[in-house]
């Protein structure tokens, strides 16, 4: 059966192994998830450098093919949120407007092996991912 897809998502581990490198070569849009915490940024610069090296033949501006998705956002963590945003200062133009808020329903959905939109569609996590989907589709149509 020959299926046609508008979008294919390749979800890679947060390592720079063979699968990730191959996915970077094959893709035409990259979403880089970044947790709102100190340790999440440790490998961030390496990943961005690898993306630059892999995508160096692409003449499009970065804003056209890469976006950083901030996850596990908690508005109560003002100091750490500010610190993370300061660290990402050079990448502000690559940030999705949507942030995925910290939400226990997302963890529970992972354990249940169900999408958050099925597991708990009224949760803030489901709302955030729905908003992300709309933003992503808008970017793809530009």
Predicted regions and their residues:
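C-terminal boundary of histidine-terminating zinc-finger modules
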Residues: 109-131
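Conserved catalytic-core segment of NTP-binding enzymes
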Residues: 2-97
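Hydrophobic residues within well-ordered, non-membrane alpha-helices that form the packing/core
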Residues: 51, 133-136
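Short, hydrophobic alpha-helical segments
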Residues: 136-142
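Short aromatic-enriched loop/helix-cap "lid" or pocket-rim segments at secondary-structure transitions
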Residues: 79-82, 108-112
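Short, glycine-rich, amphipathic interfacial segments at transmembrane boundaries or analogous
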Residues: 102-108
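Active-site donor-binding loop signature of nucleotide-sugar glycosyltransferases
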Residues: 98, 102, 121
């Amino acid at each position: 059966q020959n299926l046609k897809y508008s979008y294919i998502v390749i979800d890679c581990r947060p390592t720079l192994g063979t699968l990730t490198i191959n996915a970077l070569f094959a893709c035409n849009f990259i979403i880089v998830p970044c947790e709102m915490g100190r340790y999440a940024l440790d490998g961030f610069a390496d990943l961005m450098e690898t993306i630059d090296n892999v995508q160096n033949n692409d003449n499009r501006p970065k804003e056209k093919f890469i976006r950083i998705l901030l996850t596990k956002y908690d508005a109560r963590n003002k100091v750490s949120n500010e610190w993370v945003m300061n660290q990402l200062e050079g990448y502000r133009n690559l940030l999705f407007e949507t942030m995925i808020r910290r939400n226990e329903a997302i963890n529970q959905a992972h354990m249940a092996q169900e999408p958050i939109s099925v597991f708990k569609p009224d949760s803030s996590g489901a709302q955030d991912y729905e908003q992300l989907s709309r933003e992503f589709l808008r970017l793809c149509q530009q």
